[in-house]
Structure formats: C-alpha cells, structure tokens
Amino acid sequence: MRPHLKILVIEDAVDLLEQITSSIGNTITYFDRSDVEISLLEANSVAKALQFVREDGDIQAVVFSWDVVAKVKELTDVVPLNGVLNENTSPAAESVSSQNANEKTTGEKSSARNAVIDNNARVIDAIKRIRPELPVYVLGDAVKGLDIVNQANGIESFFYRNDIISDPESILGYIINDFDDRNETPFWTEYKDYVVESNDSWHTPGHSGGASFRNSPYISDFYRFFGRNVFVSDLSVSVDSLGSLSDGTHAIGKAQAAVANTFEVRHSYFVTNGSSTSNKIILQTLLREGDKVIADRNCHKSVHYGIIQARAMPVYLDSVFNPEYGIFSPPRMAQIKQLIEENTDAKLIVLTGCTYDGLLTDLKQVVNLAHEHGIKVFIDEAWFAYSLFHPALRDYSAIAAGADYITHSAHKVVSAFSQASFIHVNDPDFDKDFFKEVFAIHTSTSPKYQLIASLDVCRQQLEMEGYKILNELLSNVAELKSQMAKFKRLKILSPSDFANMFSHFESDNIGHDPLKILIDVSALDYSNQEIHRFLMDEVGLEIEKFTHSTILVLLTLGGMRSKIVRLYNALK
C-alpha cells in the first residue's frame, strides 16, 4: 500500500486536455518515485471536475486551465456530500435556496443558472469550499498571468500553458514537492530513524530498551506481549535531536508548525496528558484572580478545575437536559447573548463546541458577539477534532468560526494515542512567553515520545486523507440510517428528534455530528444493562455510552465499513 498522488487536470478543450495530461504523464517515470503512486484524472468540464473533487478522496492536486467555460449552476450545485447535520441541508444552503425561490420566477432562475461566469476565480473558490487543503496549479496565457494571480485566491502556483506542454517536468516537480511537504512528518521521521540506529543506551529510562524486562524470568512476559519496538522507542529527553516538548524545539517544533498549518491557525502545541491538561493550560494562561469567565455549567470538569486554579469568577450558563433520553444540549443562545451583554468585562467565554452526544453549537454567533465586546473565546472541541476536514462538518468548526483558543482530544475520534491532545491558538494578542511558562508547569519533563509521534502522524492523516475517510464514513452512516429505518423498535435519532427534545434546537441553529450515532432503544423490552451485556458478551461490541433509553456509538477515523456491518447485524 503506497500513498497515491492523483492529479486532477481541468480543461474543456478536449485536444488540449489530452495534450496536457499526456505531457505530464510521460514525465512521471523521470522522478523515480517508486514510493508513491502517481496518476492523472481528466475533467473536460467544471461540473465533472467538482464531482471528482467531491467523490474522489485520492485527488491530491488540481491543474486548472484558466479560460475554461463554467456556468453558474455548476458552482451553485456544489453542496457538501452527505451534509446530514440538519436533515441533509446545511443551514446556510437552505437559507440561500429559500431566498432565491422567493425572489425569482422559475424562468429567471433557469436563465441565471445557465449563465456563464465572468471570473474563473470562482471555480477555484468552489474547489476550496469542498477541499481547502488541495493545492491548485493554474495554467494560463503569458499575457494574462499577473491578472489571473491578482484575481484569484488559493492559487498554489501559475504556469504558462505552452511551457507545460514543452516542459511538463517543471509543473510535476512542483506538484511532487508540495505533496511531499504536506505529507511530511518531522518528528515521526526523526524519531523512527533514531530508534532504527539502535544506539547503546546509557541514559533514562532505566529499562534500557527493554533489557531489564527481556532478561528477567519474572517480567519477560511483559516484554513479549508488547514487543521490541515499544521498548527501544521509549526514549528520554536526553536525545537532543528530537527536541523538547516544553520548549518546542527541533523536530517537535517542526511537527507543531505543521499542525498549525494543517489546522489553519497561528500556533499549535502537543500535550501528552490529555485535553484535561490542555484546558487547564489555556485557562491559567488567560485568567487572573478575580477575572470573570462565562462558562457552560455542563463543560468538562477540567474547565471547572482550571477556573478554580486561576481563582477566577465563573458566570455560569444553565445546563439544558432532556431527562427522557438522558442527554444535554448546548446552552441556549439567548442566554449566551444575555450573559455576554451583561458581563462585557468578562475576560473569556468557555463553551463545549460538540457535546458527548454530538450536538453542536453555532459558534459563529458566539464568536462574533464576544469579539464585539473584546471577550476571548475558548472552545473545548475534544469530540470534534475532524470538523475542518469535510464541508458537511466545517460550518460548526470552532476554528472556522474564529475562536481564539481550541483544544482537540486527538485520541478520541482521530488517530492519536490515548492522552494525546492538541492546543490551537488563533488569538492575535497571544502571550507566547507566558503560555510557555504555564505549559511547563503542567507538562512532564519526561513526556512519552510515542504520544508525540502519534500526534505527528495524526496530522499527516488528516491532511492527506481526512476528507476521503470522512466522506466514506458519512456515506456509510447514511446507509446505516436508511437500513435501520426498517426496524420497528430501534431508531437512530435525527435532527428532527432533537428539535422535539429541545425547544431551542432550530432557533439556535444547533447541529448534530452524524458520526455520533445515538440509537433510541426505549421500545425494547430490555434494560440498558441487559442490552450492554448482550452486545458485549454475545457479539463482542463495546459501546461508548448507555443511558436508560439510548446507546451512543462513535464512528471515528478507524470506523471501517465492516464494523458498521457488524453493528447492524447485532442490532437487527
């Protein structure tokens, strides 16, 4: 299994499209990259190109020939695949659709949709709305080069069209280099290389690469169970080349910079003792004794502890609980606005962006109002670390909303080890030096390097295949919902069900993460303990959470289709 660099080429002149792809394709062997599969995909229309971008997660680069003819309808039809946050329609798309329907007759709408767009920068914008991580390389005429670059945002590089045909190696070289940069793992690569060298250890940890376990008649089974690599890769801060977690130097610093680039923030930091510690680091950085902080009463206990440690004064938002199903919703937007306006001297507002059950706050409203009053916004997004990487989820992302501080439990729903966490900072007033002092207070001087490496490769996966995996998961969830709709006594709860549970669900534009599958089991003639015992003991399924009337199933980046089939088979 190799990484796949699939290059989408967009040109509506068929002969020219074939000429461009043939020229680039014939140079692939020049680069001697047996470690990467390189292929090309042709699109002779914008509609087809955008369909490929939506459906083919292996696309890693786009070559766009400027002057392609595109119609308005090809761009307005760009909607998130499986956008199931609010009954298959995002709030923004639904609002625009309704407004257009009121303002135009059918004939006027048809004419407008078939109109040719006057600026191909809109095509690039459409690509970026679906896959913002995709680099777009523009081909154009020499005389238009500067005009094109001035018109369009999101261009990775520009090439004269004739030069590409005569010298295709230049653009392919650029594409491969950019692919390698995105795919880079600064810490994991350095770490792995050091371990493979098998240096003779005369430093901590005391087991010396597992020798104390391996040579013992009493505890050698511990070594055999985990295997050699776990022990030889258990290193110490004595290895200077790997850098320091508290200082963010060398390979660790480079890996953290890569995370910040992927998540589109100013700074990112690795934390190896969970988002509980990440939350406390942020709170102690921002709050002083007596400072007001507006907080969700139902937030994680680490937020309460952090407020206590800082000796700050909490102003609590009321919890909203549904006793029938045993789940909490986000606080009411009306109360959030009220407390912000009544406490304009507050230093910070802290909210849980995504609840345990997947209910999502419309954070853009919160951020905009808080920033109007000079209040910083900190979002605990522990359960929604993948939110940026698919358009069906992005509207509810804390980073996309403009929050100042965000924490992600990278071990909960993406591919890092337990206790691995990200801190993201977007605050223009960030006091980096003071943050580092607080970070050092809460951070071990002997961090587990495997956790740091897992955060590095977690970023790599989200950057390179996050969209592809999420797209497949969302498609699988939609199919599971369709199949389970046939059941008489089991039901996957949907946004309409949440709207019935919480009176503010629709008015507050609350969303739901479809990868948190909440199943209503109240119609079954079994207790939740009996259901739990059956799923665990009889079919070997360990479920995330039970209430008296629901079970919560998490689909994460490891949620293969076969797991979904096993779940369906157990419930059927």
Language model region names:
Residues 55-62, 342-348:
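Short acidic/histidine-rich motifs immediately flanking catalytic phosphotransfer sites
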Residues 43-46, 247, 277-493:
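Conserved PLP-enzyme active-site core in the AAT-like
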Residues 163-248:
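Conserved PLP-binding active-site segment in aminotransferase class I/II-type PLP enzymes
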Residues 36, 46-47, 56-131, 142-147:
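Conserved phosphotransfer microenvironments
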Residues 229-274:
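Conserved N-terminal alpha-helix of the aminotransferase class I/II PLP-enzyme fold
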Residues 478-572:
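Conserved C-terminal alpha-helix-loop-beta "cap" of PLP-dependent enzymes
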Residues 138-140:
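Hydrophobic/aromatic residues positioned on beta-strands within the core alpha/beta folds
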Residues 4-25, 29, 39-42, 49, ...:
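Conserved acidic segment of CheY-like receiver
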